[in-house]
Amino acid sequence: MIQQESRLKVADNTGAKEILCIRVLGGSSRRYAGIGDIIVATVKDAIPGGNVKRGDVVKAVVVRTVKERRRPDGSYIKFDENAAVIIKPDNDPRGTRIFGPVGRELREKRFMKIISLAPEVL
């Protein structure tokens, strides 16, 4: 469950290490984002020489959340951290690698490129 001012780890190789959520996309009064939702964020921490630098405003898709999410079969999925992948305007990832597992909900939301790059889909 990601909301404004939430800080997320970046799970790709764009050069950003941490982002801060500015806005949850999908309606004027939408408060929370879960796995597979798109947010607008600013880069808070980045490595030198990366594709993005500190202060850049980017779009990202949430791939892991600490808050558990109920699946249609009755099971729950939750992760140890909140993480996101920075995306381009056409919803493809900006980086070329994805680190760590991602939620299966990304497949339903049609983020196939992220699914194919991820080492594990839970």
Curated annotation (Swiss-Prot):
GO terms for cellular component: cytosolic large ribosomal subunit. It comes from the Bacteria. SUPFAM superfamilies: Ribosomal protein L14 (SSF50193). Keywords: Ribonucleoprotein, Ribosomal protein, RNA-binding, rRNA-binding. GO terms for biological process: translation. One of its GO terms (molecular function) is large ribosomal subunit rRNA binding. This is Large ribosomal subunit protein uL14. Binds to 23S rRNA. Forms part of two intersubunit bridges in the 70S ribosome. Belongs to the universal ribosomal protein uL14 family. It comes from Mycobacterium marinum (strain ATCC BAA-535 / M). Part of the 50S ribosomal subunit. Forms a cluster with proteins L3 and L19. In the 70S ribosome, L14 and L19 interact and together make contacts with the 16S rRNA in bridges B5 and B8.
